[in-house]
UniProtKB/Swiss-Prot annotation:
GO terms for cellular component: extracellular region. Disulfide bonds: none annotated. FMRFamides and FMRFamide-like peptides are neuropeptides. It is found in: Secreted. Belongs to the FARP (FMRFamide related peptide) family. It comes from the Eukaryota. This is FMRFamide-like neuropeptide PDNFMRF-amide. GO terms for biological process: neuropeptide signaling pathway. Keywords: Amidation, Neuropeptide, Secreted. In larvae, expressed in the CNS and thoracic perisymapthetic organs (tPSO) but not in the ring gland or abdominal perisymapthetic organs (aPSO) (at protein level). In adults, expressed in brain and thoracic-abdominal ganglion but not in corpora cardiaca and corpora allata (at protein level). Its main location: secreted. The modification Phenylalanine amide is found at residue 7.
């Protein structure tokens, strides 16, 4: 998946 704003 896309790791855009993963904290």
């Amino acid at each position: 998946p896309d790791n855009f704003m993963r904290f």
